[in-house]
Amino acid sequence: MGFLRKKTLRREFDEKLTEQLFKQKEEWNRQKKLVEKSLEPSAEVLYELKVAEAKYFFYLREAKQRNLKISRWK
């Protein structure tokens, strides 16, 4: 009984993790484009870029640690 529940929870968490990973990648790319298009990016915009980058790499490390196989890498 407990084993099946554990497997289901792991699969649900893995799906949420991959979803968050892709969302964060899109956010990071959006922030990068905003900085590239800006003549003089403000400190706040640069801060948001660093935060988005840190979150993306955190999710990426977590996915690698959990040995996720993601079939739709963008």
Curated annotation (Swiss-Prot):
This is Uncharacterized protein YaaL. It comes from Bacillus subtilis (strain 168). InterPro entries: DUF2508 (IPR019644). It holds the Pfam family DUF2508.
